[in-house]
Amino acid sequence: MCRSINSRPGPQPPEPLGGNAMKQYVITISRQFGSMGRSIAQALAQQLNIDFYDRDIVEETARRMGLPVSVISDTEENAKSVYFRRIYPLGMGVPNLRDEIFLVQKNIIRDLAAKSSCIVVGRCGGSILADMPNRLGVYVYAPYSQRLQNCTQKLGMDEATARRMIREVDRARELYHRRYCPEVKDVFTDHDLMLDSSRFGVEGSARLLAHIAQTLFET
């Protein structure tokens, strides 16, 4: 379920999934590029009837910082931003502004998690919300061949573009986490569950995670 951040209501009691009330909770999802982690998060949000945040965080960051959405989207996990190469051709100021973007997003993520049950995709959400008592951290991955197939068949990329995107986006996310979550030494840290999406598909993965959330967070 995805609405504008500013149009969403304040704290609401979590919707019951299987007839029993649920505590307020948050699910953080990290993923390999092409593993369909974002699609799984969307399907999971629909099954649990809770909010899903990904692109919304970018838009809210742009609003708070007074920058174009395209700038935030291009730079939040990309050290080779076209915008920053143009504004800071010698690299001066880039780290500080990228750090500011991260700090703004960190505050947004914490605000959203405090407001109501939700799913947060990427952006070191697992590390940022590691102190939350009712948090489920999920890492979605898949074999390279399956990710390549997802990119070409489901995301409409040609094979050369898919291979390049898998390589570059995975690397960018690794560098992003290394900079802003230095305490996270490997993909197991801050994740309670590693999910191979090739085994279950998008809907099957979402159903599995919904069942786990119900088991963990029912009152």
Residue spans of the language-model regions?
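Conserved phosphate-donor/acceptor-positioning beta-strand/loop module used by diverse small-molecule
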Residues: P133-T152, E159, I166
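A conserved segment at the C-terminal end of the G1
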Residues: Q42-L48
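Small-molecule kinase domains that catalyze NTP-dependent phosphoryl transfer to phosphate-bearing small molecules
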Residues: K80-I87, D158-E203
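ATP-dependent small-molecule kinase phosphotransfer cores
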Residues: A62-S117
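Short, Lys/Arg-enriched N-terminal segments with co-localized hydrophobic residues
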Residues: M1-A21
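Pre-Walker A (Motif I) flank of P-loop NTPase domains
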Residues: K23-I27
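Short beta-strand-centered segment that lines the nucleotide-binding/catalytic pocket of NTP-utilizing
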Residues: F52-A62
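Glycine-rich phosphate-binding P-loop
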Residues: I29-Q42
